[in-house]
Amino acid sequence: MYFTMYMCKFHQLLVAAMAAMSFTCAQAQSTLPSSINEASATAVMQNIMTRTSVRKFKQQPIEDAKIEALLRAGMAAPTSNDMQPWHFVVLKDQKSIEKYAASNKYHAEDIKKTPLFIFVCADTTRMGEGQGKELWVQDCSAVSENILLAAHAMGLGACWTTIYPIQKKVDGISRTLKLPANLIPLNAIIIGYPDEPLEPKNKWDEKKITYGIPE
């Protein structure tokens, strides 16, 4: 109920923002009709605001076309100096998933029930030297958020499960997936068709915002 009220408020703000955008577009003689701009912005914002983490899935395989679409969405993410330091390991066949499950005694049964794993990894050979060599964390995080949003847009559920920077997990996953030394797993995104409806959380908090520079 509270989230519904929150979404109504969000919609009111979006309408106001779109009105301002329509005015700006008109000034700039935009080639796109305002109705297209408004519909597109509404769909994008609705997708962002209604996404939530899903951990329980139907035993239904995900179509290859959707898997490729998820990976394409990930690779469309922003990247420092266009390094594109990402590499993906995809587990979609039951044999591979069961191999992965066998390496994790605490979550083996849940792993077996997950239709798709996308491990987002960093290829350290594509990064620079000095402080810049750690920028892969930001790049691969942007990749991961794109995948989460794309999954939601396609009617799939997904959840980011952390690997890096927990070294024990990094080492264990690297051994299980037989990753070469230049690949570092950031996370495993678990994906499937949701087994139950989940209501997104309202995370809005004005106290976490500072406008301007204090005197």
Predicted regions and their residues:
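Bacterial N-terminal signal peptides that target proteins for export
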Residues: F3-L14
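Acidic, surface-exposed loops and disordered segments
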Residues: Y6-C8, C25-E215
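Intrinsic structural disorder/low-complexity segments
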Residues: L14-V15, I189
